[in-house]
From Swiss-Prot:
It catalyses: S-ubiquitinyl-[E2 ubiquitin-conjugating enzyme]-L-cysteine + [acceptor protein]-L-lysine = [E2 ubiquitin-conjugating enzyme]-L-cysteine + N(6)-ubiquitinyl-[acceptor protein]-L-lysine. This is E3 ubiquitin-protein ligase MIB2. Ubiquitinated. Possibly via autoubiquitination. It is found in: Cytoplasm; Endosome. The modification Phosphoserine is found at S251. CDD domains: RING-HC_MIB2_rpt1 (cd16726), ZZ_Mind_bomb (cd02339). Zn(2+) 1 binds at C91, C94, C115, C118. Interacts with actin monomer. Pathway: Protein modification; protein ubiquitination. Induction: Down-regulated in many primary skin melanomas. Treatment with a demethylating agent, 5'-aza-2-deoxycytidine, restores expression, suggesting that down-regulation is the result of methylation of the gene.
């Protein structure tokens, strides 16, 4: 049976003691709850494979068996913290939709489900047997009725618990200082990602914040006063480390629908209503879309079909309610593929090919007829041709968004140049109403002034669709602009396309004209017919000084255009040539770096997609919390950088953004999966060295090693690293240092696979189809190389050697160990990297690097190889090296006393009514208030004496 990837052990799961428990009161007693914070790995002496480290709510941190030696010390109480969710399932007791965590389904009653909390609180009939579903994809496990079974009370961090800062605390003095207690007021989920994974805590000073209790495997709190969290049936919880069996899944090839398919619902309303029960539900408005054509947006976890009918309307349908027709329908906008030879081949028997069709290649057209045999009549390039559906692709306007910007700019420039030429060539009557525009186009200030004096009412008359002020702004004629403004020209008057004079100044790259118009009070954020402001226009044209002038005068840098792109989105799309514009925009104080365009890309996503390193760095400096933000498909900035081979961007996200390198998208792919999938050889060592798990699996159960062996491109040779990507050369050098064939002998897939095996990837790991990397390495030479790399990794682990690359790991609190694995003999003397003396090197924890001698290690706070904070320094005999004494500082008692005095002083001068402003008015009784509060009072709020006089003070 295939294991369910979400049912495997993951950090963040909440656990209780299990059937093989033999560790006394480490959990605080039966019913104590803990969080899985670390997974065991091959070769580790304290946390070997199939073990976990648990942070108990009451503070102990210890490792336990999760299948190791056949024992299971723990039971899984809740997996909502890792994002487990059952879409379209409603708890029939508490009515929560999209049930989180394990699902409990009654075997007696029809379609009756409970969430974990309701099941454990004895909701529904106790004599009824239930099925347990660990995840949405796992097979049900039949359980005995709850009647007569013992229930164990839960204790730990629940609502009402008293807590202090815990092992993963990184929130400064939000709690009021070390050891200050707070009270848990709520347990909730983190946005839509996870459930019951954070606690809302109110501290002694009255402030309330949210802290992690399982979210991403972190625990910010320690329980000092337990609270009751309900009950659990020990016999009904799954053993941690024994994955649930996966339901038989239909392969993608046999799915009736795929993303992008055109579908219709042709059923009667009553039939559709019945079919929708349990498959997205029924809404009366769905009847309006019966018979209409929609597009398959996605397939849900349960196999239901999400259909989009227009820009705003999506419905979830039972797959049996939909009918799939031709790929394209009359009225669909399509693009003809651009490859001539391919089109000729595909057209055989489908309308055939003539040379007259060549202008249609790569062009966008519209389907005007669908023939019975599936061929399509398409209007394109002024003609109508019959095409095979294989020659067409669905046209998405967003694909050409950047092209549209450039095309519009060229069209604007071209049309303006033609208009100016026509104006200058005009030989109209001097008294013609549009003569003023001609004189401005010719730069004749004296004649323009004369016309303004004689005919001031003609100041806004148009010629060639433009006013004199618009032409002067485009040409940068500052003197004429001032004359026209003095004559009360319409500064915000638009042309036929909605462009104002400010737009024209931006189009003409005229920063001084821009400043003059802004000083005259023009609308800085006026939009044209494409929803673009002058700032959009200047950014799209790459005019740095105009952008600077607009930003200096307070233009709104957050307004979106027709594609929902802000000016910074457009600047990022322009590439490194617009770096100066990016710098100017990101320095604007009120810029919204969380802005999202119509494709769901935040600015950080967009910069990562385009590989704009400067923009990524600037955005992270403003809002580092966005580094792990996900799009609708689960992609983060690091996913996008990995997918598009932007190595520098990935480095910035990892080193400066401190992103989660093991984050998953909706297909459970990590950034390493994507880099390997796209054969981006240079990114693989970077991600692995940053701590990306080499054994993480996607929704198909494939690890990066499985994916690598499906890539067959020849490995690019990197002879000179000058100015190039050092990643491929780094990967090759590591392979060669291990005695493996070099670049001339391996394909990309084989080279990456060997590298991953050297870094600890499991060559025997089976995916959901039951295939391991060794099964995929069909070629004997590759199979032999892969086995050799795996053997080298095992030898290195057995010998206690360091990893071949500087693996970055986050430091963790000290862990008490229950389990010990025999270690190899201690290391011999080696050269210290600092003083170059031959000595026994000190082992740094947690990174496990040996780089310096004892004398040099004393003052080190970070490992010089991987820059990870050192929590322990161990001699070869296991004794700890004392760190150098810190410089003397003020006694802690003195610091706390001063802080207390400061708070008292602050309280004495703060208004007791609004508790916001300082006291500005003092009453005759000696008490006081701020001016707004004190003016409205008739009696003192403290002593209740009537107020006869108010004395204003200045603090």
């Amino acid at each position: 049976m295939d294991p369910d990837p979400q049912a495997g052990v993951q950090v963040g799961m909440r656990v209780v003691r299990g059937v093989d428990w033999k560790w006394g009161q480490q959990d605080g007693g039966e019913g104590g709850v803990g969080t899985v914070v670390e997974l065991g790995r091959h070769g580790s002496p304290s946390t070997p494979d199939r073990t976990v480290v648990v942070q108990w709510d009451q503070g102990t941190r210890t490792n336990y068996r999760a299948g190791y030696q056949g024992a299971h010390d723990l039971l899984l109480y809740d997996n909502a913290q890792i994002g487990v969710r059952h879409p379209n399932i409603i708890c029939d007791c508490c009515k929560k939709h999209g049930l989180r965590g394990m699902r409990w389904k009654c075997r007696v009653c029809l379609d009756y489900d409970l969430c974990t909390q309701c099941y454990m609180h004895n909701k529904h009939e106790l004599a009824h047997a239930f099925d347990r579903y660990e995840t949405a994809h796992s097979r049900p496990v039949t359980l005995s009725p709850r009647q007569g079974l013992p229930r164990i009370p839960l204790r730990g961090i629940f609502q009402g618990a008293k807590v202090v800062r815990g092992p993963d605390w990184e929130w400064g003095s939000q709690d009021g200082g070390e050891g200050k207690p707070g009270r848990v007021v709520d347990i909730r989920g983190w946005d839509v990602e996870t459930g019951r994974s954070v606690a809302s805590v109110t501290w002694a000073d009255g402030t309330t914040n949210v802290y992690r209790v399982g979210h991403k495997g972190k625990v910010d709190l320690k329980c000092v006063g337990e609270a009751a969290g309900g009950f659990y049936y020990k016999d009904h919880l799954p053993r941690l480390g024994k994955p649930a069996e996966l339901q038989r899944r239909v392969s993608a090839d046999s799915q009736p629908f795929q993303h992008g398919d055109k579908v219709k619902c042709l059923l009667d309303t009553d039939v559709l209503r019945e079919m929708q029960e349990g498959h997205g539900g029924w809404n009366p408005r769905m009847a309006e879309f019966i018979g209409q054509t929609g597009t398959v947006h996605r397939i849900t976890d349960r196999g239901d079909v999400r259909v989009q009918f227009n820009h705003e309307t999506r419905w979830t349908f039972h797959p049996g309610a939909l009918t799939k027709h031709h790929s394209f329908w009359v009225g669909d906008v399509v693009r003809v593929i651009g490859d001539l030879d391919t089109v000729k081949r595909l057209q055989a028997g489908h309308g055939e090919w003539t040379d007259d069709m060549a202008p249609a290649l790569g062009r966008v057209g519209k389907v005007v007829k669908v023939f019975g045999d599936g061929n399509l009549r398409v209007a394109v390039a002024g003609q109508r041709w019959t095409f095979s559906p294989s020659c067409l692709v669905a046209y998405r306007p967003e694909e050409d968004a950047n092209l549209d910007v450039a095309e519009r700019a060229r069209e604007n420039k071209s049309s303006l140049s033609v208009a100016l030429d026509k104006l200058r060539a005009q030989k109209s009557d001097p008294e013609h109403p549009g003569r003023l525009v001609v004189e401005v186009a010719l730069g004749n200030a004296a004649r323009a002034l004369d016309l303004l004096r004689r005919r001031p009412e003609q100041v806004d008359t148009k010629n060639q669709g433009r006013t004199a002020l618009q032409v002067a702004a485009y040409l940068g004629q500052v003197e004429l602009i001032r004359l026209l403004l003095q004559a009360r020209a319409g500064v915000d008057l638009p042309d036929d396309e909605g462009n104002t004079a400010l737009h024209y100044a931006a189009l003409g790259n005229q920063p001084e004209a821009t400043r003059v118009l802004l000083s005259a009070g023009c609308r800085a954020d006026a939009i044209n017919s494409t929803q673009s402001t002058a700032l959009h226009v200047a950014v799209q044209r790459g005019f740095l000084e105009v952008v600077r002038a607009l930003c200096e005068r307070g233009c709104d840098v957050n307004l979106p255009d027709a594609h929902s792109d802000t000016p910074l989105h457009s600047a990022i799309s322009a590439g490194t040539g617009a770096s100066g514009i990016v710098e100017v925009l990101t320095e604007v104080p009120n810029i919204d770096v969380t802005a999202t365009n119509s494709q769901g890309f935040t600015l950080l996503h967009h910069a990562s997609l385009k590989g704009h390193a400067l923009a990524v760095r600037k955005i992270l400096a403003r809002a580092r919390q966005l580094v792990d933000a996900k799009k609708e498909d689960g992609f983060t900035a690091l996913h996008l950088a990995a997918l598009n081979n932007h190595r520098e961007v990935a480095q910035i996200l990892i080193r400066e953004g401190r992103c989660d390198v093991n984050v998953r998208n909706r297909k459970l792919q990590s950034p390493l999966h994507l880099a390997v999938q796209q054969a981006h050889v240079g990114l693989v060592p970077l991600l692995v060295d940053a701590g990306c798990s080499v054994n993480a699996e996607d929704e198909e159960g494939d690890t990066a090693l499985h994916v690598a062996l499906q890539r067959h491109q020849l490995l690019p040779l990197v002879a000179d690293g000058a100015g190039g990507d050092p990643g491929p050369l780094q990967l090759l050098s590591r392979l060669q240092a291990s005695g493996l064939p070099g670049s001339a002998e391996l394909t990309v897939g084989a080279a990456v696979a060997c590298f991953l095996a050297l870094e600890g990837a499991d060559v025997s790991y089976t995916n959901h189809r039951g295939r391991s990397p060794l099964d995929l390495a069909a070629e004997g030479r590759v199979l032999k190389a892969l086995q050799g790399c795996a053997q080298r990794f095992r030898e290195r682990q057995a010998g206690g050697g360091a990893a071949p690359g500087p693996r970055q790991t986050l430091g963790t609190p000290n862990t008490v160990t229950n389990l010990h694995v025999g270690a190899a003999p201690g290391p011999e003397a080696a050269e210290c990297l600092v003083c170059s003396e031959l000595a026994l090197l000190v082992l740094f924890s947690p990174c496990q690097h040996r780089t310096v001698c004892e004398e040099c290690a004393r003052r080190m706070k970070k490992c010089i190889r991987c820059q990870v904070v050192v929590s322990k320094k161990l001699r070869p005999d296991g004794s700890e090296v004392a760190s150098a004494a810190p410089a003397p500082g003020p006694p802690r008692q003195l610091v706390e006393e001063l802080q207390s005095r400061y708070r008292q002083m602050e309280e004495r001068i703060t208004c007791p009514i609004c508790i916001d402003s300082h006291i500005r008015l003092v009453f005759q009784c000696g008490h006081g208030a701020c001016a707004p509060c004190g003016s409205a009072l008739s009696a003192c709020p403290i002593c209740r004496q009537p107020i006869r006089d108010r004395i204003q003070i200045f603090v």
